[in-house]
């Protein structure tokens, strides 16, 4: 008779007398799966902070595969750290471990956690709002608080301002290298994280509203969180004009029209356009120019947009 052992990952093998499902996770513990460790921070690359984190990780296991999202998060900008995670993490393989360090509260009572998402990705970070968008998009399977007695770099207890190196890189490396299981991170917490409030996308009375979470920095395009399904409720056709209003809090920053296009080359240089970016979210741009610089439109949890015919 076949016997099943229930966990989050299984393989099936044939044995004499039937089929047995064996958990890939020893004794129901959860291991990261692929030795991949991905970093992001607001440290910049002008000094040795990022290299120190990677050195700690390689000291845990030289077999780790280390990658970066970015280390150019503006200093203390937790919202942008949250967005860069959700922009990139869904494209990484299941089992990937991410270390995100944008930590203006370093050394205080804020919790250090590892989030396991329903997609099977791990996020090692301070619980300060960094997980806002990841938790919404990928879902929360479990949250654990890092036990710094067991999961902290040796002889680092006198350091209070570099948890990126001493706690997050160290713990992330141990998890990614299967030195520890997810359950060995620390105590299980309620399935919730600190969340930054923002305007959720919505449609009402012939208008679509959303947030401007980020800029396409290199080109000055303005990215929103309005997807095609929501936008299509406006019944705007390709080539039509879109009425746009942009606010920062209660202050109106921009009001005007843009042409709805698939891509920039459909209009002359300098023409304002509305299009869908590579994440299939509505965006504002100027052919061969910066919409952000032209109209002083920026991004963050307080920036929101209204679209209409």
Per-range role (PLM):
Residues 156-238:
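Anionic-ligand-binding alpha/beta catalytic cores of soluble enzymes and soluble regulatory domains
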Residues 16-29:
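Bacterial N-terminal signal peptides
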């Amino acid at each position: 008779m076949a016997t099943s052992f229930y966990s989050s990952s299984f393989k099936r093998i044939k044995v004499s007398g039937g089929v047995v499902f064996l958990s890939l996770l020893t004794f129901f513990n959860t291991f990261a799966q692929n030795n991949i460790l991905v970093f992001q921070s607001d440290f910049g690359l002008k000094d040795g902070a990022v290299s120190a984190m990677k050195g700690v990780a390689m000291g845990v296991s030289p077999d780790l595969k280390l990658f970066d999202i970015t280390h150019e998060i503006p200093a203390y900008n937790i919202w942008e750290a949250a967005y860069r995670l959700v922009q990139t993490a869904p494209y990484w393989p299941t089992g990937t471990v991410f270390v995100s360090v944008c930590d203006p509260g370093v050394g205080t009572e804020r919790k250090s956690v590892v989030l396991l998402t329903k997609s099977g990705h791990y996020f090692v970070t301070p619980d300060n709002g960094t997980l806002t968008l990841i938790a919404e998009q990928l879902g929360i399977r479990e949250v654990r608080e890092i036990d710094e007695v067991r999961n902290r770099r040796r002889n680092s207890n006198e350091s209070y301002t570099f948890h990126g190196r001493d706690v997050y890189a160290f713990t992330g490396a141990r998890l990614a290298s299967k030195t520890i299981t997810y359950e060995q991170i620390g105590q299980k917490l309620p399935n919730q994280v600190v969340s930054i409030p923002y305007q959720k996308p919505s449609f009402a009375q012939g208008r679509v509203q959303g947030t401007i979470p980020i800029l396409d920095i290199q080109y000055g395009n303005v990215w929103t969180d309005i997807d095609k399904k929501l936008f299509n409720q406006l019944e705007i056709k390709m080539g039509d004009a879109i009425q746009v209003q942009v606010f920062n809090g209660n202050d109106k920053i921009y009001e005007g029209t843009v042409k709805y296009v698939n891509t920039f080359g459909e209009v002359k240089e300098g023409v304002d356009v509305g299009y869908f970016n590579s994440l299939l979210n509505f965006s504002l741009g100027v052919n061969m120019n910066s919409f952000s610089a032209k109209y002083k439109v920026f991004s963050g949890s307080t920036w929101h947009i209204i679209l209409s015919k």
